[in-house]
């Protein structure tokens, strides 16, 4: 099974590319979705988070109050490290389980949609690394327009991620998303053809 890591900075259009790959029948393991799944009621990570950060991070129905957790987890580097120590191993474990399940079911390709692929060193575990790339100023413009974020907030988020040149060095294939949505569809079609050529 061909394991593909798909990544890109915030506002790069990575999720759009993941959706286009999914619509072609490729299995997507979405790291953000896995992160949500591992803190569902009944999951060990949720109990550990409540123990570490206090029972008041739980809503009355027993689900995680994300804003409440964020308010406690991002006040210091130590608290953020504690959050990561609880969640990151579980995300890695569950993601690996989903990859193995896909392989057992005969999938030829599985795509790991992971914002922090390079930061976490997971690019080295992939057969193919795809980076969706957009100029920083264009990403800022799109995020301010489409998500209603402030420019300062966008720039802070971009600065918290690995620089684009580091991400690009890890890439086997770069999908350029500086153009229109139609251009991105054309880039995705080329990517799909490249993937299929490697598995057929």
UniProtKB/Swiss-Prot annotation:
Query: What GO biological process terms does the UniProt entry carry, in alphabetical order?
Result: coenzyme A biosynthetic process
Q: Which domain of life is it from?
A: Bacteria
Q: Which residues of the sequence carry a binding annotation for ATP? A: 11-16
Q: InterPro entries in the record, alphabetically?
A: Depp_CoAkinase (IPR001977), P-loop_NTPase (IPR027417)
Q: What is its EC number?
A: 2.7.1.24
Q: What transmembrane ranges does the database entry give? A: none
- MF term (GO), any: ATP binding
The answer, when asked if Nucleotide-binding is one of the entry's keywords, is yes
Q: Which reaction does it catalyse?
A: 3'-dephospho-CoA + ATP = ADP + CoA + H(+)
The record's Gene Ontology cellular component field reads: cytoplasm
Where in or outside the cell it occurs: the entry states: Cytoplasm
Name the pathway: Cofactor biosynthesis; coenzyme A biosynthesis; CoA from (R)-pantothenate: step 5/5
Is Cytoplasm tagged as a keyword? Answer: yes
Per UniProt, the keywords (alphabetical) are: ATP-binding, Coenzyme A biosynthesis, Cytoplasm, Kinase, Nucleotide-binding, Transferase
**Residue intervals of the DPCK domain:** 3-200
Role played:
Catalyzes the phosphorylation of the 3'-hydroxyl group of dephosphocoenzyme A to form coenzyme A.
Name the NCBIfam families on file.
Answer: dephospho-CoA kinase, PRK03333.1
For this chain, the family text in UniProt reads: Belongs to the CoaE family.
The name this protein goes by in its record = Dephospho-CoA kinase
Give the organism's phylogenetic lineage.
Bacteria, Bacillati, Actinomycetota, Actinomycetes, Mycobacteriales
């Amino acid at each position: 099974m061909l394991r593909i890591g798909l990544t890109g900075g915030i506002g790069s259009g990575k999720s759009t590319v993941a959706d286009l790959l999914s619509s072609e029948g490729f299995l997507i393991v979405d790291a953000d979705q896995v992160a949500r799944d591992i803190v569902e009621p009944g999951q060990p990570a949720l109990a550990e988070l409540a123990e570490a950060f206090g029972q008041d991070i739980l809503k009355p129905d027993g689900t995680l109050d994300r804003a409440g957790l964020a308010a406690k987890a991002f006040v210091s580097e130590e608290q953020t490290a504690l959050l990561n120590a609880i969640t990151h191993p579980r995300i890695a474990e569950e993601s690996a389980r989903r990859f193995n399940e896909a392989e057992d079911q005969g999938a030829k390709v599985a795509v790991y949609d992971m914002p922090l692929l390079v930061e976490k060193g997971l690019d080295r575990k992939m057969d193919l690394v795809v980076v969706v790339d957009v100029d920083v100023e264009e990403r800022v413009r799109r995020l301010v327009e489409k998500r209603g974020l402030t420019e300062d907030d966008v720039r802070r988020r971009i600065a918290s991620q690995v620089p684009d040149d580091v991400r690009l060095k890890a890439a086997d294939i770069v999908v350029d998303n500086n153009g229109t949505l139609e251009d991105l569809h054309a880039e995705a079609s080329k990517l799909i053809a490249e993937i299929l050529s490697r598995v057929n």
